[in-house]
């Protein structure tokens, strides 16, 4: 059997695979904020990015390595293809971390070998020991992945895994790259690897999966029963296509059904020892932070973190819950950090009080960003009688979007009504500090604002999505706006909140435009799709 650390290790790849979701690109400050929250959550490994992809990705991984973790914190991991330039860039980026890992991979399925890598099995068998050994020359902790393992020939897969372990790999990852496999098949695959790889006892067995058939979490739980001891997942299940296995669902399944899973770890069913090191009370906070910063809205009926996850509409259910919550609830909402607590901050509250609450919510702002957030808080306090944590999260989340801001919104004025043509006057401050104003008509107030902004910024794009939701209850609630725009096939999202949804829409659109402009001219390399941009000798 594979090496057993005595519990399930949680490998979070929100900042790498999760960020590959269309429109979910994050800037350096946003990535750092998420990494700091992941450390509070208690994940074992943070895959901080793909350093070779771009200078921006390298800088973000390096910043996280410098600022997150510590001797008692998570391992900081970087992804690299089986290529010396990739591996060297990864090693340099993660170098500042006290605990670091290089995660390198190569495809093993015949379809990938023939159509993507254009290599033979023998060539792959030659590459694996060279690249794992090269990674091992930089760090003690090396993870090796067999890309598309779920569709690979088993005998060849066993051979590759054995070779990777003998070359120094500490963790072997088995990805279901295209979300194709079913739970029973995945369980059998993990069991077969345990039974047919002679040196598997020298490495931890890990799994990585996508949700194309909606089976990622079920697949992982079956893998755990058969010896997998590291789960690679993302907050809110974000990721390419249909997403990745959702961290919060995996954690709570192992938490709520501990008595079922305990025997697979050699424990008695009643053992109270947690199966992971994750602090479940940080789950909701982590989910909201990732949703706010990526602009990817969590579906209301999403398990564990959706708005309806703990809601009861049926009269029969409501009656049962009022008598005893266990009648219809298997999870106490407080276990995942969900509460309706109001923050006792008002007009006379100081910056230190606001900073303390923000830190509790997972935000660590610098002085300038704190001042901006505090100003917005005071403005909101003048307009709202009660301010909730959700309000505070909404008004502060866009502060970490500003470091790359090339356009700043200064003024929005709208005139509209039943007998008026919607008209917007907008003033924007450019990178050079020059103010420009435009007036535009539209089919509605938001359309007029967007047209005015387009005439000022001159950044062609296609508006793909516009959504508004209320942050809290009440007529004075903040309106949270998410906007997605597209240029050249790439999606960029913007997010903002205000009691005036037109103002929120204008700021969200500006935030999306800033992401678009910042990304223009510095396209990142995709770790699985872009092979031409690497020295072929190293693959």
Curated annotation (Swiss-Prot):
Belongs to the alpha-IPM synthase/homocitrate synthase family. LeuA type 1 subfamily. It holds the Pfam family LeuA_dimer. Pathway: Amino-acid biosynthesis; L-leucine biosynthesis; L-leucine from 3-methyl-2-oxobutanoate: step 1/4. Transmembrane segments: none annotated. Its EC number is 2.3.3.13. The keyword Isomerase does not apply. It is an enzyme of class 2 (transferase). Catalyzes the condensation of the acetyl group of acetyl-CoA with 3-methyl-2-oxobutanoate (2-ketoisovalerate) to form 3-carboxy-3-hydroxy-4-methylpentanoate (2-isopropylmalate). NCBIfam families: leuA_bact (TIGR00973), PRK00915.1-3 (NF002086). Residues 408-539 are annotated as: Regulatory domain. GO terms for biological process: L-leucine biosynthetic process. PANTHER family: 2-ISOPROPYLMALATE SYNTHASE 1, CHLOROPLASTIC-RELATED, HOMOCITRATE SYNTHASE-RELATED. It is found in: Cytoplasm. Mn(2+) binds at residues 17, 208, 210, 244. InterPro entries: 2-IPM_HCS-like (IPR050073), 2-isopropylmalate_synth_dimer (IPR013709), AIPM/Hcit_synth_CS (IPR002034), Aldolase_TIM (IPR013785), LeuA/HCS_post-cat (IPR054691), LeuA_allosteric_dom_sf (IPR036230), LeuA_bact_synth (IPR005671), PYR_CT (IPR000891). Homodimer. It catalyses: 3-methyl-2-oxobutanoate + acetyl-CoA + H2O = (2S)-2-isopropylmalate + CoA + H(+). This is 2-isopropylmalate synthase. One of its GO terms (molecular function) is acetyl-CoA C-acetyltransferase activity. It comes from the Bacteria. Its cofactor is Mn(2+).
């Amino acid at each position: 059997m594979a090496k057993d650390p005595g519990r399930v290790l949680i490998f979070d790849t929100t900042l790498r695979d999760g960020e590959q979701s269309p429109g979910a690109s994050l800037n350096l400050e946003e990535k750092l904020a998420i990494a700091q929250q992941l450390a509070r959550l208690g994940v074992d490994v943070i895959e901080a990015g793909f350093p070779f992809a771009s200078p921006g990705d390298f800088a973000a991984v390096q910043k996280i390595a410098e600022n997150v973790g510590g001797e008692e914190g998570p391992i900081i991991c970087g992804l690299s293809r089986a290529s010396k330039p990739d591996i060297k860039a990864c090693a340099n980026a993660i170098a500042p971390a006290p605990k670091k890992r290089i995660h390198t991979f190569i495809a093993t399925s015949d379809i990938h070998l023939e159509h993507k890598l254009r290599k033979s099995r023998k060539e792959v068998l030659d590459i694996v020991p060279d690249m794992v050994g090269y990674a091992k020359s930089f760090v003690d902790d090396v993870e090796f992945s067999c890309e598309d393992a779920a569709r690979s020939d088993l005998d060849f897969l066993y051979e590759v895994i054995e070779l990777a372990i003998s070359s120094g790999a500490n963790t072997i990852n088995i990805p279901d790259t295209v979300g194709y496999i079913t739970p029973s098949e995945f369980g059998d695959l993990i069991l077969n690897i345990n039974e047919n790889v002679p040196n598997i006892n020298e490495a931890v067995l890990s799994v990585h999966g996508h949700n194309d058939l909606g089976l990622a979490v079920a697949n992982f739980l079956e893998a755990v029963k058969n010896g997998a001891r590291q789960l690679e997942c993302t907050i809110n299940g974000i990721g390419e296509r249909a997403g990745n296995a959702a961290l919060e669902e995996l954690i709570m399944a192992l938490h709520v059904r501990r008595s079922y899973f305990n025997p697979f770890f050699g424990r008695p069913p009643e053992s109270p020892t947690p199966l992971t090191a994750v602090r479940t009370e940080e789950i909701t906070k982590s989910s909201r932070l990732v949703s706010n910063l990526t602009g990817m809205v969590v579906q209301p009926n999403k398990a564990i973190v959706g708005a309806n996850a703990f809601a009861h509409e049926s009269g029969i259910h409501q009656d049962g819950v009022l008598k005893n919550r266990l009648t219809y609830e298997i999870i106490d909402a407080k276990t995942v950090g969900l509460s309706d607590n109001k923050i006792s901050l008002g007009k006379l509250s100081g910056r230190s009080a606001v900073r303390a609450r923000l830190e509790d919510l997972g935000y660590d702002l610098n002085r300038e960003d704190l001042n901006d957030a505090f100003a917005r808080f005071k403005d909101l306090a003048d307009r709202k009688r009660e301010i909730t944590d959700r309000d505070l999260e909404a008004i502060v989340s866009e502060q970490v979007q500003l470091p790359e801001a090339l356009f700043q919104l200064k003024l929005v004025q709208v005139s509209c009504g039943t007998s008026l043509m919607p008209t917007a006057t907008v003033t924007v401050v450019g990178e050079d500090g020059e103010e420009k104003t435009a007036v535009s008509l539209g089919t509605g107030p938001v359309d007029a604002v967007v047209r005015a902004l387009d005439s000022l910024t001159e950044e062609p794009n296609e508006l793909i999505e516009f959504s508004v939701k209320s942050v809290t209850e009440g007529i004075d609630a903040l309106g949270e706006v998410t906007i997605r725009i597209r240029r050249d096939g790439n999606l960029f999202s913007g997010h903002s909140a205000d009691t005036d949804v037109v103002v929120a829409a204008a700021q969200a659109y500006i935030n999306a435009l800033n992401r678009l402009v910042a990304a223009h001219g510095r396209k990142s390399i995709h770790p699985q799709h872009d092979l031409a941009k690497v020295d072929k000798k190293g693959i």
